[in-house]
């Protein structure tokens, strides 16, 4: 390009739309690399809604382990590989995400699998599949997880 370009990833508080933190780099940086920089600025006791483009078990696992009750929710990516561990309720499953050798190389502490929760919700006639780190079904009942239209906006849908 004939002019400077910057790639930027921002974190926004959902109700006020105020930006809480941002990371930027060159066009050579991936958005996931920039999102990694937001981990330390993310507060405890939060739920971060992510676009499906940020699907990376290493990033998501690191995000939730970086503090107290730092949860994430992300639309299930088409073709994502998972194994159902058990059913928690209607449209609510505990799943195991298998980790690729490439991801284990990039994230050495990751291990062979990550446990997550798969929620299936219907909004305006569309079925949305959402992954979240809120695996405790007693503390976070399916109706309380925040799985709403905002979460489904960029999600995997089916009729």
Describe the residue ranges of each PLM region:
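Single, function-defining residue in the core of a domain
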Residues: 2-159
